[in-house]
């Protein structure tokens, strides 16, 4: 369907969803995209934990992974991240099906799929929990992540939920 075949109201509605309501300098969905890719790039380069902590809400934080208790503080996340680095040699995140929706003037909801690839250390005491196949140290997990991101002086993740890759997006 071309834009000429849309009614004027439908055409303008489609275009206005991107209008910067809070000025040209306001954070928009492309800023959230950039942040999301930067987040995963830092994982792939084994960045220091301080990068993540500066982008995670500490008081009301909730980071949830399948089969684990939620991480609710910076200390919880730092412990989880230290374990990730201790158990793996490398990892890579292939992000797809990214959807971003503004849910409040200073809040976004992002949902996307991640094909997470990596290699667990052969001497890991958690080998079975990381492996995708019992005959390989390489792993591949397809996951859905859904983030609630707050806008302030920087983007901050308040809630991060990881589910199986077959879970539907909450953004319609």
Language-model regions: role of each:
Residues 1-16, 107-109, 130-172:
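Short beta-strand edge/turn micro-motifs at domain boundaries
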Residues 1-54, 62-64:
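Short, low-complexity N-terminal intrinsically disordered segments enriched in polar/charged residues
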Residues 27-35, 87-90, 95-97, 152, ...:
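A broad structural signal for short, well-ordered beta-strand segments within beta-sheet-rich domains
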Residues 49-104, 112:
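A solvent-exposed, acidic/Ser-Thr-rich amphipathic alpha-helical stretch
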Residues 56, 114-118, 164:
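Short beta-strand segments enriched in hydrophobic/aromatic residues
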Residues 72, 119, 165-169:
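Short catalytic/ligand-binding loop motif for oxyanion handling, primarily in non-cytosolic enzymes
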Residues 79-82, 125-131:
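Short Pro/Gly-enriched beta-strand edge/turn motifs at strand-loop
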Residues 104-126, 141:
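A short hydrophobic beta-strand element
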């Amino acid at each position: 369907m071309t834009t000429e075949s849309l009614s004027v109201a439908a055409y303008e509605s489609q275009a206005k969803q991107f209008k910067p309501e809070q000025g040209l300098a306001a954070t928009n969905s492309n800023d959230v995209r950039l942040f999301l890719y930067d987040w995963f790039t830092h994982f792939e380069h084994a960045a220091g934990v301080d990068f993540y902590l500066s982008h995670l809400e500490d008081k009301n934080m909730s980071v949830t992974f399948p089969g684990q208790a939620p991480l609710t503080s910076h200390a919880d996340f730092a412990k989880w991240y230290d374990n990730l680095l201790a158990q793996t040699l490398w990892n890579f995140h292939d992000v797809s099906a990214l959807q971003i929706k503004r849910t409040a003037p200073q809040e976004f909801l992002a949902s996307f799929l991640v094909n997470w690839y990596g290699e667990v250390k052969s001497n890991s005491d958690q080998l079975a929990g990381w492996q995708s196949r019992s005959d390989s140290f390489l792993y591949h997990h397809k996951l859905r992540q859904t983030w609630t991101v707050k806008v302030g002086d920087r983007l901050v993740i308040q809630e991060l939920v990881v589910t199986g890759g077959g879970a539907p997006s909450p953004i319609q």
